[in-house]
A protein has these predicted regions:
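Carbohydrate-active catalytic/glycan-binding domains of CAZyme proteins
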Residues: 1-326
Length: 326
């Protein structure tokens, strides 16, 4: 959110197409069409809106001169963003080359975010890839364009060194973002996995959150040493919402409403026109066609995410194909 023009931005990467953003002054209303960022190569773009009205975009990019010294050698770069022209301007500058400890040849410095906290600028990035070596590292500087110095106790979040046989393990933790509550507390949201049998991850990457601590020398961190990422975080004064769909629960959808519930998902984009709740009341009718899941199109496919390692589900299906393509 940019308070200077009262505008919300969502910026991301469409792999194979490029980086783009959409914007609005009402997040519950209409958003703009995608606005491409052709000068921004690489992935994982993130906006930073400074107190002086200037804006910046940071992201993961290639090694200097596109000449990597090893596999996974990447950089974090920054460029000023013109909020009036909706485009990046000026030179692209390298903020981080390789990672927090270049001598160790770290891989995949990515997912950067810029913050200004208590007069200091912080650059936070994921490092180590998204598997078991996943982590988060932090740098501090005097301006959005650097120079940034890594914290001596990086990483600020990881579970890579812990015993794989520990109970209720959380693994692959990284790609974090920071948020401050109205009360002034800092929290982190990040990606991690809950493996089954300490090996497999049938739930994929999930979103976690935990409170942020601050070091004596003024750096934020989530874990140090053998600190565990908790499966459940309890906060004083906050009552658990028993109606939420976590823990053991049962649900049934009779498809008797006017719209699908928020838990239902489609592939790539909304499947508008490919399903109906009114054609046969009490049923979800899929309008099959010849689109396969491997094509860059929207198939007649509706699903919901797995939330547990073990579960049971069933559905009643009436299927009368009219052609081989169905």
């Amino acid at each position: 959110y940019n308070p200077h023009n009262k505008t919300y931005y969502m910026v991301t990467t469409n792999v194979g197409v490029g980086n783009f953003f959409v914007k609005t002054q009402d997040p519950f209303g209409e958003w703009s069409d995608p606005i491409m960022l052709p000068e921004v190569t690489g992935i994982d773009p993130s906006f930073f809106f400074d107190e002086d009205g200037k804006a910046y975009l940071v992201n993961n990019d290639d090694a200097p001169d596109n000449k990597p010294e090893y596999s996974g050698h990447r950089t974090i770069r920054v460029q000023e963003f013109d909020v009036n022209a909706d485009k990046t301007v000026g030179p692209r500058k390298i903020l981080v080359n390789k990672g927090a400890r270049p001598e160790d040849k770290p891989i995949w410095i990515e997912g950067p975010h810029l913050y200004k906290i208590n007069g200091n600028y912080f650059l936070m990035s994921a490092e180590g890839g998204t598997a078991g070596w996943h982590s988060e590292v932090i740098f501090r500087g005097d301006s959005p364009t650097g120079k940034f110095t890594p914290w001596k106790n990086n990483p600020i979040l990881t579970q890579r060194q812990l015993d794989a046989e520990r109970p209720n393990p959380v693994t692959c933790a990284g790609h974090a973002d920071l948020v401050q509550t109205r009360e002034g507390d800092w929290w982190a949201v990040f990606l991690a996995c809950r493996p089954i049998n300490n090996t497999f991850e049938n739930l994929g990457r999930e979103t976690f959150m935990m409170p942020v601590k601050w070091s004596e020398d003024g750096f934020p961190y989530m874990t140090q040493g053998d600190d565990l990422v908790p499966v459940i975080v309890r906060r004083e004064g906050v009552k658990r919402d028993e109606s939420a769909t976590f823990g053991n629960f049962e649900m049934n959808d009779g498809f008797d409403g006017q719209t699908l519930g928020m838990e239902w998902m489609t592939l790539r984009a909304p499947a508008t026109g490919l399903y109906s709740l009114s054609q046969t009341p009490g049923y979800l009718t899929l309008k099959c066609d010849s689109v396969s899941a491997s094509e860059k199109k929207v198939p007649a496919f509706i699903c919901r995410r797995l939330q547990h390692h073990k579960f049971e589900c069933s559905t009643r299906m009436l299927f009368c194909p009219q052609s081989k393509a169905e």
